[in-house]
Structure formats: C-alpha cells, structure tokens
Amino acid sequence: MTQSKNKVVIFLGPPGAGKGTQAARLAQEHQLVQLSTGDILRDHVARGTALGQQAGPLMEAGQLVPDELLIALIRDRLADMEPVRVIFDGFPRTQAQAEALDLLLEELGAPVSAVPLLEVPDQVLIDRIVDRGRQAVAEGRAPRADDNEETARKRQQVYREQTQPLIDYYARRGHLYTVDGLGTPDEVYERILSGMH
C-alpha cells in the first residue's frame, strides 16, 4: 500500500471476529486513521458542535442517529484529510448507509478500496466473546455487559440479518473479499493484506 494516495477500508464481520484488533494494526502500520462513528458522535457532543447538539439528545434517549446526520459527521471528519486514508470500523451497518457513504467518498475522490469480511464459525465467536468476559474478570476488570453466551448468540443473529445485504452490496461492487478469521492475529492480518489490491 502506498501512503501518498487515498485508501478507504471497511471492515465487516460478526462480533468477536477480531475486526477491532485487525483494524487497529492496519491503521498503525499503514498510516490510516481508524474511524468509529461512535467516537465521532461522542466528540461532537462533547465539543457542543451543531451536529453534536442534534445527535446528543438522540443518543441520550437510546435512539438511532439518522443516517443523514452520521454522514454529515463523517463528512466533517474527512473534510480536512488529504489524502483520505481511513478504516471504517462499525460503519456502515446498512445498505442505505453504504450507499450514502459511497456518494460522499466519490465526492471526495476517495472511493472504497477494500472490504475485508472476517469469517469465523459461530461457536468460535461465542467462545471468544465469553472468554473475553472471563479474562476481564481474571484481570480484575469488569467484563463488558454483552460478554455472555446468550447476548453473544443474539448479537450473531442480529449481525446476520442486518449485514447480509451489506455483504451482497460490496460483493456486487467488487470490493469485498473473505478472510478466514481463524488462527493467530498475525496469520489473520497477513490474509487481510494479501487480499487488498
């Protein structure tokens, strides 16, 4: 990957597949900015920006932030980035969001470069999530509230229902490639790199 040109990577995969771990490493080693819409939202709310003032009450009420507002927040974040070198982690979640993001990226002259889909068998994912909770307790940290088997299974089901149209969308555009998410983090990382063009 050259560092002087635009690069937009969107990680897809179920909860527990290792997207965050792999995205962080790719960002660090290839001078990409890892963007989390949640972090962007919280930053705007904390700074009291106009966009943050719109998003804050929705977030406090536990409501979804409308796609138009999310895209406006992303547009604001990418506006000063030259070249645009980002990894999206946790966004888009729907085909409508993907289509809106594509329009924005085309405006910026920075189309999607790659969409690695981390695939891991469901039972392995559930075991990873439950183990993550156990490890937190063993280290004296509070486990994430959703690091239990019942919640993990529900999250897998929701992921499958919500994400399949997104997988199909990026596959039709030729951006998607499947990565075997089993093995060591280094092995998975090498598979991610080998799939990028």
Swiss-Prot record:
Keyword ATP-binding attached: yes
Annotated spans, LID: 131-147
InterPro entries membership: Adenyl_kin_sub (IPR006259), Adenylat/UMP-CMP_kin (IPR000850), Adenylat_kinase_CS (IPR033690), P-loop_NTPase (IPR027417)
Keyword Cytoplasm: yes
This protein's pathway: Purine metabolism; AMP biosynthesis via salvage pathway; AMP from ADP: step 1/1
Endpoints of the signal sequence: none
Ranges where the record places region Disordered: 137-158
GO process terms (BP): AMP salvage
Primary localization class, coarse: cytoplasm
Residue sites binding ATP per the record: G16, A17, G18, K19, G20, T21, R132, G183
Gene Ontology molecular function: any one: adenylate kinase activity
One cellular component (GO) term of this entry: cytoplasm
Segments of skewed composition (Basic and acidic residues): 141-153
Residues annotated as binding AMP: T37, R42, Q63, L64, V65, G90, F91, P92, R93, Q97, R144, R155
Keyword field: ATP-binding, Cytoplasm, Kinase, Nucleotide biosynthesis, Nucleotide-binding, Transferase
Compartments reported by the entry: Cytoplasm
Catalytic activity: AMP + ATP = 2 ADP
E.C. numbers: 2.7.4.3
Summary of subunit composition and partner proteins: Monomer.
Biological function: Catalyzes the reversible transfer of the terminal phosphate group between ATP and AMP. Plays an important role in cellular energy homeostasis and in adenine nucleotide metabolism.
Family: Belongs to the adenylate kinase family.
Domain characteristics, as noted in the entry: Consists of three domains, a large central CORE domain and two small peripheral domains, NMPbind and LID, which undergo movements during catalysis. The LID domain closes over the site of phosphoryl transfer upon ATP binding. Assembling and dissambling the active center during each catalytic cycle provides an effective means to prevent ATP hydrolysis.
NCBIfam families according to UniProt: adk, PRK00279.1-3, PRK14527.1, PRK14531.1, PRK14532.1
PANTHER family, A to Z: NUCLEOTIDE KINASE (PTHR23359)
Protein name: Adenylate kinase
